[in-house]
Amino acid sequence: LRWLSAVIASLLLAACAPTPGGLSDPIRRKAQWHATAGGDDLRAGCAAGRPSRWRLVYNSVWDEQVRVYDIERLPAGEGARLVSTVVQGAPRVLQAYLMQLGGQPTTRVAESRLPEPQLSALLRAIDGAGFARPPEEGMRLVSWDFYWLASACVDGTWHLNAWRRGDPVFQRLGFDELLFALDQTGVEPNRPRAIDPARRALEAGEQAGGGRGSRDESFEFVVRDGRIWSPGFGN
């Protein structure tokens, strides 16, 4: 039965790999989120000679709003393609489907082209935030708070970094406001605010009845060896 186990494992890996439109479907979004947030597809396809790509994820409390910005370099001098995706809250799968059936789509997607000057300004801001530096080993990124997670393959080299609310640099990233201004989804960003962990835990417990599932949909990523890991999503 080894062949069957191998087939099942391959199918599971394929289901968890980021796919076009995956964020718009609640089931695929949940299955693929770890790989999408961590830029696994960018890393897997990273090679010299391929167009440079960037992905910036803004987690502004997982069950309130999540924004994903995918940038792909066009031929020299032509700028880049920007795909902006906003998930208005990331409720449980059944809730998301019911919202969509009721005419309340949970996801907005917009595609635009960045002229070379705008792309250059954005990349300077990303570099200015310290993207190229090694990420903090063991950094915890909790879903019920605010953070930015960025991954990129530039000139055949892949890299990842992250910034959390509360970190000094988080207040002056620069690239965040540029992305919000370039975003054509029409959805206002969920701005950072103070989060009380104790109150958050209490609210989650009340929503789930205080039972085993009292953490509700909360999870965390941990930065390790230049990648993100999470027992809740598998690695």
Regions found by a protein language model. Name each.
Residues 17-235:
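Function-determining sites in protein domains
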Residues 1-16:
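Sec-dependent bacterial lipoprotein signal peptides
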